[in-house]
């Protein structure tokens, strides 16, 4: 795995703790729970597209939304999608800033988009299972957008 992707994964895990109060680790031995929502965002990394996505189980999705917003959003799907999308945007902004400090050009190109259910790219640059007491998630990196859904 490239240094850029490793840095992204580290930034993502730190962002979960910092912004959503959710401890998480990479655990490839853990089986992913069924995906409730997939959220993606288009970044540009050193002149190449990088689509990063988070596929979350229902428990993880609502826990992230509630952890980020500071209020329970259980069952409030649209508000929860907005909260997790904003969380993802904040984490990706932090990643962009971190990479720029290291001399790399990483920019956010488009706002997050979401799809209810699983979405997978034809070709992955990286994929890893993230486990947490709040539920399981899959973190995905690709070169082409694969979430055909609504922006928010």
Cite the ranges covered by each PLM segment.
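N-terminal auxiliary interaction/assembly segments of multi-subunit proteins
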Residues: 1-152
């Amino acid at each position: 795995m490239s240094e850029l992707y490793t840095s992204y994964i580290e930034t993502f895990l730190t962002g979960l703790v910092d912004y959503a109060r959710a401890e998480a680790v990479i655990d490839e031995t853990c089986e992913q729970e069924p995906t409730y929502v997939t959220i993606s965002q288009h970044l540009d990394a050193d002149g190449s597209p990088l689509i990063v996505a988070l596929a979350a189980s229902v428990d993880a999705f609502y826990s992230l939304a509630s952890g980020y917003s500071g209020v329970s959003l259980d069952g409030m799907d649209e508000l929860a999608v907005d909260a997790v999308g904003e969380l993802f945007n904040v984490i990706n902004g932090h990643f962009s800033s971190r990479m720029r400090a290291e001399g790399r050009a990483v920019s956010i190109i488009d706002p997050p988009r979401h799809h209810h259910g699983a979405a997978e790219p034809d070709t992955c640059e990286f994929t890893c299972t993230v486990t947490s007491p709040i539920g399981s998630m899959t973190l995905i990196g690709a070169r082409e957008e694969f979430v055909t859904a609504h922006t928010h």
